[in-house]
């Protein structure tokens, strides 16, 4: 009986060793998977940091490029002064803002509307109010002569939207004849906005964009002068293409979504003149889609880093 017990023990020893080794291996696997998870988390965090750093570097480079271009234009402008000052620089001293200390670059969608106000603007304001979204309206001075236009402008200001200058006349051939002619037009609509709302506009959009088929002889000088005065101007990187004539609401929506999906920071060009019925019709569905996709919206301010067109070679 004693011999049989010893025999059983001998058989049990290898089994115990196998079980012990299996337990050790299982522990090592647990540690290994835990370590792998920790390393994976660290890698993901580092990748996110790298992406954020690249974005910061890109923003800094864009700001540096803008400042460099501005300095070049100022230098060119200064070299042409016969007595240290060009005549148009003495015009409208009230059109001077305090120096800008820097730009912000938020990853948001900036909705902008040109050529209003009109009855379309009322529809657009209603849609924006229902969704608590603020936008930017670059207004035309000739639309502010009516009581309706003035009421709409006051509503823009009261509801927290940004009011920017577009033009008084929207006559490209006349406003782009010279820097002085542009300033004369700018001053007219600036005064109207201030008188109606008490708001002094700080941003603007050149009719046709900063570089267009009408201002080729003066655009560098004109941009330098407006920047010298402290105003920020904005082109766009997403277009609804609603300025091209008759275009459906579905096409406007597709154009906007395609552009917005391509950029982390979008300045969207749309129009709110009376003829742009499909723009107002497209807006609710467009906004609801973007909201569902997690996009955030903001109005432009003078401190928003501009999107601007490149100068032609």
Give the role of each language-model region.
Residues 113-116, 142-143, 167:
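Active-site metal-binding loops of divalent metal-dependent hydrolases
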Residues 140, 147, 153-155, 159-162, ...:
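Glycine- and small hydrophobic-enriched segments that form the cores of compact globular domains
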Residues 135-143:
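A short beta-strand-loop structural module common to alpha/beta enzyme folds
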